[in-house]
Swiss-Prot record:
It is an enzyme of class 2 (transferase). GO terms for molecular function: transferase activity; zinc ion binding. It is a single-pass membrane protein. The gene is ATL39. It catalyses: S-ubiquitinyl-[E2 ubiquitin-conjugating enzyme]-L-cysteine + [acceptor protein]-L-lysine = [E2 ubiquitin-conjugating enzyme]-L-cysteine + N(6)-ubiquitinyl-[acceptor protein]-L-lysine. This is RING-H2 finger protein ATL39. GO terms for cellular component: membrane.
Length: 132
């Protein structure tokens, strides 16, 4: 048996391995180029597209929602312990001004929900559409 016949399997394996590695490298390079081109296109598209108008509510509409002091409302609903504002995650304290969001009747710190509603027209908890 000649030397080449004995090592034929090794040679075939080596060429197959080299081919697989070359295929993997080329495939990786092509994907990377596509991702860069797509990212550059997204950036360019974002620059060219007109800016969206603000989606929140205006200040007058926000101020029209009912507001009250926490001390006044604390005794209205018996059985409810400490409540917290889901926007800032702080508990309500005596003498803080709260604001009620009309369609869903959720309550928040007035300052917190005013900022939220100036950017978004939905309730921070249930995402109900807030209409003044």
């Amino acid at each position: 048996m000649s030397y080449f016949k004995r090592n034929e399997g090794t040679i075939v394996f080596a060429f197959a391995s080299i081919g697989f590695i070359a295929f993997y490298i080329i495939n990786y390079y092509i994907r990377r180029c596509r991702n860069r081109a797509a990212a550059a296109g997204d950036i360019e598209e974002a620059r060219m597209s007109p800016r969206r108008p603000p989606r929140g509510l205006d200040a007058e509409a926000i101020k029209s929602f009912p507001s009250f002091v926490y001390t006044e409302a604390r005794g209205i609903e018996p059985g409810i312990g400490e409540l917290e504002c889901v926007v800032c995650l702080n508990e309500f304290k005596d003498d803080e001004t709260l604001r009620l969001v009309p369609p869903c009747v959720h309550v928040f710190h007035a300052d917190c929900v005013d900022i939220w509603l100036s950017h978004s027209s939905t309730c921070p908890i249930c995402r109900a559409k807030v209409v003044p």
